[in-house]
């Protein structure tokens, strides 16, 4: 079958124009990053893979410890803090955003992390040029300030210039804003699709599996927490009947549900005088084995998408438990995230090369290279 005859796949992310906000939507409801993160965080295996990916992308931090400990914004955050947050966004979204502030001379004076999910791109002009990154604290409109919801409208959005450290450009932007005190700065917005481009993170292709992973976990949890788990039923002769018998029986049954009430005995009284006390074993329906194959497939696909199959095999003992083998697996994965680390390093370089002179302990590219987790791997401590 050729391409023409195959069933066409749906577009993964809708980027239609939202005229009310002047932006390109990120997803059909403009909440694609938020929904991706929610699905990942609800999936036991998906969140494990992303957290591991973030740890390895962050590595042991940038090489220069002096620079790492230096405050880089007006909120007291250090470069190490900035690197940590950008690494986490890279793990979740394969992109990150940094807010850049300048002085009146067009020199950078601060760099602050912006949550990637808070950023949207302005619609391109007739020349295809995107001029602003649009930032809102919560595109779902649920965040409140002083007890009032922060509505999603232009008044509550910050339209911030795209990163361009050229001193002349910066000074012209400052003049247009009415002075440095009114200037909103710039945003460095980078994804694996390039600068100022929405991207589809690698997690996108296994969102179905991660959603299913959450669902199976819920079923198994309910099986343990809410299932009917008595050890058996004791049948005895009933005495004088009461109007409250039916209500009491229903309450007794409810008390036998869940793990905290497992292995108790349900007592039932019958009206037949000839009935003798009898104990009847009670076997409840267990759903654990119903999803064994499904769960295994979900896990395999999730770990494979994040290139972490060896970690899963190591965890299950499929390839043994030796310390050397574990170190080899960790070392291999540390090498796999070098592409993401280079993206971060290039971004830091673009910022630091235009920083206010003689205010940072930055001496060149070697200072901002990211140290991989090789030392931790060698010591077997990670």
Model-derived features: where do they sit?
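Generic structural marker for isolated residues within well-ordered, non-membrane alpha-helices
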Residues: 68, 299, 349
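Short coil/loop linkers at secondary-structure junctions
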Residues: 78, 308-309, 358
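Surface-exposed loop-to-helix/strand elements on domain peripheries
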Residues: 19, 228-244, 266-343, 353, ...
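Structured, contiguous alpha/beta core segments that scaffold functional sites
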Residues: 2-48, 54-61, 65-271, 381-382
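Long, intrinsically disordered, low-complexity Ser/Thr/Pro-rich regulatory/activation regions
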Residues: 348-354
């Amino acid at each position: 079958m050729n391409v023409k005859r195959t069933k066409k796949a749906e577009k993964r992310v809708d980027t239609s124009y939202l005229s009310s906000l002047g932006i390109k939507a990120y997803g059909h409801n403009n909440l694609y990053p938020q929904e991706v993160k929610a699905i990942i965080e609800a999936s036991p295996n998906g969140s494990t893979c992303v957290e591991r990916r973030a740890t390895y992308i962050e590595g042991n931090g940038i090489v220069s410890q002096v620079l790492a400990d230096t405050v880089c914004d007006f909120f007291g955050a250090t470069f190490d803090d900035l690197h940590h947050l950008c690494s986490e966004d890279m793990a979740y979204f394969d992109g990150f955003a940094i807010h850049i502030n300048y002085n009146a001379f067009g020199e950078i004076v601060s760099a602050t992390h912006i949550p990637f999910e808070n950023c949207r791109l302005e619609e391109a002009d007739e020349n295809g040029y995107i001029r602003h990154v649009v930032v809102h604290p919560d595109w779902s409109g649920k965040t409140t300030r002083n007890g009032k919801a922060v509505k999603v409208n232009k008044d509550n959005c910050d339209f911030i210039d795209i990163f361009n450290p050229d001193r002349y450009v910066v000074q012209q932007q400052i003049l247009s804003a009415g002075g440095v005190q009114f200037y909103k700065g710039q945003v460095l917005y980078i994804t694996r699709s390039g600068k100022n481009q929405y991207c589809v993170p690698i997690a996108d292709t296994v969102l179905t599996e991660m959603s299913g992973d959450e669902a199976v976990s819920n079923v198994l949890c309910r099986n343990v927490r809410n299932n009917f788990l008595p050890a058996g039923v004791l049948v005895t002769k009933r005495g004088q009947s009461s109007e409250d018998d039916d209500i009491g029986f229903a309450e007794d049954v409810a008390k036998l549900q869940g793990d905290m009430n497992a292995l108790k005995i349900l007592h039932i009284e019958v009206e037949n005088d000839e009935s003798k006390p009898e104990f009847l074993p009670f076997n409840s329906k267990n759903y654990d084995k119903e999803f064994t194959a499904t769960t295994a497939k979900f896990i395999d696909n999730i770990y494979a998408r994040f290139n972490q199959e060896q970690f899963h095999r190591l965890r299950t003992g499929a390839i043994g438990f030796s310390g050397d083998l574990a170190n080899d697996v960790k070392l291999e994965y540390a090498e796999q995230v070098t592409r993401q680390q280079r993206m971060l390093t290039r971004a830091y370089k673009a910022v630091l090369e235009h920083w206010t002179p003689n205010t940072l302990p930055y001496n060149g590219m070697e200072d901002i290279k990211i140290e991989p987790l090789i030392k931790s791997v060698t010591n077997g401590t990670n």
